[in-house]
């Protein structure tokens, strides 16, 4: 990767000098000016940074001292660009803004020079570099925290594998250009790193170069045992063994895409490890708020809803502020006219950008007749608590992509709290983002069940999906076809960073079946048009291709 875009490889908080002074440098090999100075790694700060990269822009405030050059801090946010790369350009979301890169996302026209994908790419590599630095200087300080950092490095690499395919690979900080790893080999490395399998992986660009030899104990076995926590409990926000189990289940359900070989049995096995663990579905509503709504509210870390959270990204309007996490998910989808009632401060800073495409609303209204009503009225009309859309004074089908009212609005994420208390800051939400939650395991297990049984769920898979439907106060079904499983994933997980990967796995994004499922503005055409399977992954950023001659660009770019 091109390190010039990643600042603070050794952040100020990460190295404490014996004299009591801090050091901040972009150099990869840090040597004290005074040979007598002893450099002591600040293990807690480095450990925290490995997690914080998924929420914060940099070292200070919402945009302050961003770790990624070239874009403002909020735009480089991990969750913000996960949303853009997974939801924009699918049947789910479209954005009204004209910021460089947004129209390209909307119309599936991204290139190697796409600024936001470049920011996402370097945000992920920043996380990998922090993890590599921790494992270099703090390995052995705390075996459990070391295992967590190994897991986080796997997670960052997973998102790179999914979005960009064959990517640069390194497990250590180095000034030389990284070699390229094949997508299937990266899959195998992540699996081995988590489970402790013995493998040898060679560089894609030079097979004589050994990139990794994994034989150590897997990270999963050394991580914390699964425990459901609230924000009041010590360890809230840390990854436990169920995070590794769910990452493996997520990889296995997509294994045919990533490696060419299906792993349905493994997907079901690891998903059921999560289902049978302590991270249970949250099923208890509070007052006017449903159980499903409470997963995405300002007190989701305190209300009990976090029992479902396997990896919550912590947001706090007072001490942890960022434009690129739940602030973005809420503000970008809200307009002031969406308030449910005068006492509901759902969004303190509406930006009026992202909304839902008409094709997606057919998941809740199959006849294409979603009413022009408020959020609470919409859920009642759909007979499904998950239909959190605002249609009043909106157009059902998007005819004017740059106008926010052309298309229904999404009211899934909120600043308001289920107990009615005020947020810490009137604009900055306290809403945590559940990057991993146990509902995903139910969906993976059901899909694997159907794929193992001729495309129809057995009683086991049907039961998993009906538990989600029961939580949403909608009717149960006798069985589910694969397309119905896909629709159930859409209803449960929309706007949480999954849709492009799901459509790719089912063949409806790019490729031979792309024209079988069209949505408005797919491929840039108002009524939709199919496109090549080369669009199923994004281009490696031009900046990296230009400086690292080890890299080969993805086909079609």
Report the location of each language-model feature:
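Short coil/turn linking the two alpha-helices of tandem helical-hairpin repeats
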Residues: 159-168, 254-260, 453-454
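Long, intrinsically disordered, low-complexity segments
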Residues: 24-25, 43, 92, 124-125, ...
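Membrane-proximal, proline-rich intrinsically disordered regions
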Residues: 24-78, 548-557
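Conserved, well-structured interaction surfaces
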Residues: 44, 48, 52, 57-58, ...
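Flexible, polar/acidic helix-loop-strand segments at domain edges
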Residues: 99-109, 119, 359-437
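Extended ligand-binding clefts on enzyme/binding-domain cores
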Residues: 276, 281-405
């Amino acid at each position: 990767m091109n390190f010039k875009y990643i600042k603070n490889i050794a952040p100020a908080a990460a190295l404490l000098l014996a004299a009591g002074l801090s050091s901040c440098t972009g150099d990869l090999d840090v040597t004290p000016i005074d040979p007598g100075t002893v450099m002591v790694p600040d293990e807690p700060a480095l450990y925290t940074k490995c997690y914080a990269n998924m929420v914060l822009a940099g070292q200070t405030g919402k945009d302050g001292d961003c770790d990624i050059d070239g874009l403002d801090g909020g735009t480089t946010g991990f969750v913000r660009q996960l949303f853009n790369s997974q939801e924009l350009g699918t049947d789910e979301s479209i954005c009204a803004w004209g910021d460089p890169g947004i129209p390209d996302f909307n119309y599936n026209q991204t290139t190697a020079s796409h600024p936001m994908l470049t920011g996402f790419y370097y945000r992920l590599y920043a996380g990998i570099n922090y993890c590599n630095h921790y494992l270099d200087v703090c390995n052995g300080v705390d075996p459990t925290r070391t295992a967590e950092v190994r897991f986080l490095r796997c997670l960052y690499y997973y998102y790179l594998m999914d979005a960009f395919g064959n990517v640069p690979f390194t497990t250590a900080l180095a000034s030389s250009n990284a070699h390229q790893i094949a997508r299937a080999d990266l899959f195998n490395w992540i699996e081995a790193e988590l489970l402790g399998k013995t493998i040898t992986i060679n560089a894609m660009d030079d097979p004589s170069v050994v990139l990794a030899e994994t034989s150590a104990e897997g990270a999963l076995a050394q991580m914390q045992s699964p425990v459901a926590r609230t924000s009041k409990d010590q360890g809230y926000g840390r990854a436990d063994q169920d995070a590794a189990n769910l990452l493996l289940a997520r990889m296995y359900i997509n294994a045919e895409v990533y490696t060419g070989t299906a792993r349905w049995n493994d997907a079901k096995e690891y998903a059921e490890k999560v289902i049978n663990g302590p991270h249970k579905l949250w099923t208890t509503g509070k007052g006017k708020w449903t159980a499903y709504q409470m997963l995405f509210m300002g007190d989701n870390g305190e209300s009990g809803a976090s029992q479902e959270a396997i990896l919550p990204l912590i947001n706090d309007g007072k001490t942890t502020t960022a434009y690129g996490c739940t602030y973005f998910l809420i503000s970008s989808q809200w307009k002031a006219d969406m308030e449910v009632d005068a006492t509901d401060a759902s969004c303190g800073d509406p930006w009026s950008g992202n909304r839902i495409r008409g094709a997606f609303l057919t998941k809740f209204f199959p006849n294409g007749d979603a009413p022009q009503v408020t959020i609470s009225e919409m859920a009642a009309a759909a007979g499904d608590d998950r239909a959190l859309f605002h249609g009043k004074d909106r157009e059902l089908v998007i005819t004017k992509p740059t106008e926010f009212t052309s298309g229904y609005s999404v009211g899934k994420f909120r600043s308001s709290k289920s107990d009615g208390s005020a947020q810490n800051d009137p604009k900055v939400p306290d809403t945590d983002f559940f990057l991993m939650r146990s509902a995903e395991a139910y969906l993976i297990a059901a899909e694997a069940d159907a794929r193992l049984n001729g495309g129809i769920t057995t009683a086991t898979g049907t039961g998993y999906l009906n538990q989600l439907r029961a939580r949403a106060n909608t009717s149960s079904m006798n069985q589910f076809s694969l397309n119905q499983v896909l629709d159930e994933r859409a209803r449960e997980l929309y706007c949480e960073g999954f849709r492009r990967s799901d459509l790719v796995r089912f063949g409806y994004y790019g490729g031979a079946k792309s024209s079988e499922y069209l949505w408005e503005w797919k491929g840039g055409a108002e009524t939709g048009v199919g496109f090549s399977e080369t669009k199923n992954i994004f281009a490696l950023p031009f900046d990296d291709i230009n400086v690292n001659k080890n890299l080969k660009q993805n086909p079609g770019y």
